[in-house]
Amino acid sequence: MTEPRLAGASITVPGKLADRAREIAAGRLSPAVPRDAATIVLLWPGVLLRPGAGVEAYLLRRTRALDFAPGACVFPGGSVDEGDADPAIGWAGPPPAEIADRLGTSPERARALVCAAVRETFEESGVLLAGSSPTALVDDSAALAQDRHALLAGTASFGELLGRLGLMLRADLLTPWARWITPEAAPRRFDTWFFAAPLPPGQTASLTAPAEQAEQAGQTGSGESDAGIWLRPAEALESARAGQITLLPPTAVTLGELAGHHDVASVLAQRRVITPRLPKVVVNDHDAWLAMPP
């Protein structure tokens, strides 16, 4: 049976990726083991500034110097670190066991995924989904610029930062959305859980901290992204079709799923069934394409 191509789009499979797929199919190469990762689709009602805008999502453009997805526009996120599973990190919201049931994994893994999602989003956008109590939220992300850069510089762990500031993760703000696994043919693979979350009132997503604080910290950003922008999902998809931005398939599919929502509340009210989605590089003697899961 022939694997279907991605409907409505042309996905070019690089020659090296096609070669790896052929090697794996022939049994001469084993797929890389995917590393756990987490990402947050930050949402806000763009209509506040742009009448008729509806829901907008925050996208970062990865630098072209990176090995994985150079130049692609992605949601804030990254790999799970060992410290993300620390049970001492303050937690507010559904217990890890409840989130684990929705994610289809263990409580320990669910805790690490939520923590990684919040940590990476703070590192990459400056938005911190945490507060001093189960109902409070940080309302001035700019005030945490030096803490953000200390985290990026590795001079403080996320758990230490939250503990010193008296903050706890607001796990209740994260809505599980999807799970995507990098194709087996890729040399670097990730098992990534997607969450949706609202931009907290008073916080601003930014690629860098205020200049004077960034200079004091000796850093200018995460180093992985060179631009950040709020876009309506349909607007982002149209920009990708026009060749103005590059979207990885999981990002494009997620934006397509969000495009039918007109307010943030309707997105966050979703209770989605989370099942792994694994795109596949399909090859024959002369061609290669990406087959998408249903």
Summary of predicted features, one role per range:
Residues 1-123, 127-294:
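N-terminal leader/linker segments that precede catalytic domains of diphosphate-processing enzymes
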